[in-house]
């Protein structure tokens, strides 16, 4: 569980460190930053890393978009994100 990522100071080093993690990561994000964060994750982790972006969990408008970081980022660039997000990102596979 990572919670919210650092906004400015320390964000790039934190993403670089997380890119090497073998565990599944859970990250919180606001609708205003979710597409940007997904793009940054794709750059740091590789665009083919799988993820799920879930919003409004246990509420009326619950939605979960699954795919690669690239696909999910493109989805939220084309469709305005609403609600609070939980990003679930797969860990690094064995090389």
Language-model region placement:
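A contiguous loop/helix-start segment that scaffolds small-molecule binding in enzyme catalytic cores
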Residues: 23-95
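Class I SAM-dependent methyltransferase SAM-binding "motif I" and its flanking Rossmann-like core
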Residues: 1-21
């Amino acid at each position: 569980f990572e919670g919210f990522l650092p906004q400015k100071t320390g964000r790039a080093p934190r993403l670089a460190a997380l890119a090497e993690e073998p565990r599944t990561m859970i990250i919180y994000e606001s609708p205003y930053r979710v597409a940007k964060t997904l793009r940054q994750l794709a750059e740091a982790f590789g665009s083919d890393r799988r993820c799920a972006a879930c919003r409004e969990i246990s509420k009326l408008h619950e939605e979960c978009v699954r795919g690669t970081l690239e696909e999910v980022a493109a989805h939220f660039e084309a469709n305005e994100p609403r609600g609070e997000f939980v990003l679930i990102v797969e860990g690094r596979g064995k090389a």
